[in-house]
């Protein structure tokens, strides 16, 4: 039995030998299509000026990824300018973005991301509720308060996938 992976679909083919010939014939072909992603790969950018928080979030995301059979690559950035520069060359599937940062705040960073034509989902992380309404203007996927509740984070990640 052979299988072919096409995008995220697995197609399994099997055939039997023909009884009256000496070579394989497709007398019986069974095609099964399974919606199953064999390797789930995710690239996530984390933009936060607090290094300890970035490490904590990275650890939580790594734990979530292992639990859900994802291969995870994390790209940490300490400010919005560095993130914007990187997004020109590094494709990401999801961005975690702090709001209160030096140089360029998270809302303005998200505005720039959208002006670049990128539709990548953004999850804001901040210690303040005051920017929640502004996050809708830049089409945020979610808004989480610091310190991050692990169960809430995992729930948001589950909703994303």
Predicted regions and their residues:
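Two-component/phosphorelay signaling modules centered on CheY-like receiver
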Residues: 50-75, 115
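Extreme N-terminal starter segment of soluble prokaryotic enzymes
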Residues: 41-44
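CheY-like receiver
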Residues: 84-161
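Acidic di-acidic motifs
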Residues: 48-50, 127
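Conserved sequence signature across two-component system core domains
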Residues: 47-48, 77, 95
């Amino acid at each position: 039995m052979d299988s072919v992976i096409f995008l995220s679909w697995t197609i399994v083919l099997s055939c039997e030998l023909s009884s009256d010939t000496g070579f394989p014939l497709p007398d019986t072909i069974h095609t099964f299509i399974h919606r199953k992603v064999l390797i789930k790969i995710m690239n996530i950018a984390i933009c936060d000026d607090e290094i300890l928080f970035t490490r904590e979030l990275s650890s939580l995301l790594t734990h979530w990824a292992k639990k859900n059979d994802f291969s995870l690559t994390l790209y940490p950035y300490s400010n919005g300018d560095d993130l914007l520069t990187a997004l020109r060359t590094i494709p990401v599937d999801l961005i975690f973005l702090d709001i209160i940062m030096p140089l360029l705040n998270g809302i303005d960073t998200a505005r720039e991301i959208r002006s670049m034509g990128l539709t990548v989902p953004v999850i804001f992380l901040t210690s303040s509720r005051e920017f929640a309404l502004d996050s809708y203007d830049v089409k945020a996927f979610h808004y989480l308060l610091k310190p991050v509740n692990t169960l809430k984070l995992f729930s948001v990640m589950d909703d994303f996938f």
